[in-house]
């Protein structure tokens, strides 16, 4: 899985990967 896919699907990612989803949300909050 690419990080791009994870950032594009923040809706279900946190459900499958709580740890990764949380990290992604933090990255999205930063704007990158």
Swiss-Prot record:
Domain of life (superkingdom): Eukaryota
Single GO molecular function: toxin activity
Keyword set, alphabetical order: Toxin
NCBIfam families registered for this protein in UniProt: amanitin
Recorded family membership: Belongs to the MSDIN fungal toxin family.
Intrachain S-S bonds: none
Organism: Amanita bisporigera (Destroying angel)
InterPro entries in the cross-refs: Amanitin/phalloidin
Name the UniProt record assigns to this protein: MSDIN-like toxin proprotein 1
Cyclopeptide (Gly-Pro), cross-linked positions: 11-18
Propeptide: 1-10, 19-32
Record's comment on post-translational modification: Processed by the macrocyclase-peptidase enzyme POPB to yield a toxic cyclic octapeptide. POPB first removes 10 residues from the N-terminus. Conformational trapping of the remaining peptide forces the enzyme to release this intermediate rather than proceed to macrocyclization. The enzyme rebinds the remaining peptide in a different conformation and catalyzes macrocyclization of the N-terminal 8 residues.
Function: Probable toxin that belongs to the MSDIN-like toxin family responsible for a large number of food poisoning cases and deaths.
């Amino acid at each position: 899985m690419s990080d791009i896919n994870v950032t594009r699907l923040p809706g279900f990612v946190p459900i499958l990967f709580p740890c990764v989803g949380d990290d992604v949300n933090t990255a999205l909050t930063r704007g990158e």
